[in-house]
């Protein structure tokens, strides 16, 4: 009797350590500028997306991953995906960002709970959550850090 192993699905990440040209994120304005491009202008008011920016110990943005894309009123975020990519790219911190298609920048209770859940999970691996931002077009955003919620 021979045993066969079943291949498991895996997340593939291209890792290129030469990141001298990667931007350094020093504040919420810079985070907004670099993360907004992952929210297409023609759909930012149509469907909700959740993306994570991954940073190294020098706060250089080493990558961005779209965790989920949902509908008009929400999206589902799997914390395991957030962490699995962070571990694969050896991130020391993360920036969380999502949009509200309604244009309302105030965080919902679900947004606050998700932030807490991700922060607690990241803490187990010594990964910092630098901010969770709710983005809109035209230079508008809500920062959990600036509002004292992180």
Predicted regions and their residues:
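Active-site-proximal loop/helix of nucleotide/amide-processing enzymes and allied scaffolds
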Residues: 1-17, 56-58, 73-150
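Glycine-rich, small/polar surface segments that engage phosphate groups of diverse ligands
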Residues: 19-80, 85
């Amino acid at each position: 009797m021979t045993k066969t192993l079943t291949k498991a699905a895996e997340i593939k990440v291209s890792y290129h350590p030469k990141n001298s040209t990667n931007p350094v994120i020093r504040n919420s304005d810079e985070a907004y500028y670099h993360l907004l491009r992952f929210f297409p202008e023609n759909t930012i008011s149509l469907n909700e997306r959740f993306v994570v920016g991954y940073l190294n110990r020098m706060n250089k943005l080493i990558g961005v991953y779209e965790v989920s894309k949902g509908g008009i009123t929400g999206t589902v975020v799997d914390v395991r995906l957030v962490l699995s990519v962070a571990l694969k790219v050896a991130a020391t911190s993360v920036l969380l960002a999502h949009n509200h298609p309604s244009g309302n920048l105030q965080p919902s209770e679900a947004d606050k709970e998700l932030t807490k859940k991700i922060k607690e999970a990241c803490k187990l691996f010594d990964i910092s959550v630098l901010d969770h931002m709710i983005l809109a077009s035209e230079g508008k955003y809500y920062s959990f850090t600036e509002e004292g919620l992180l």
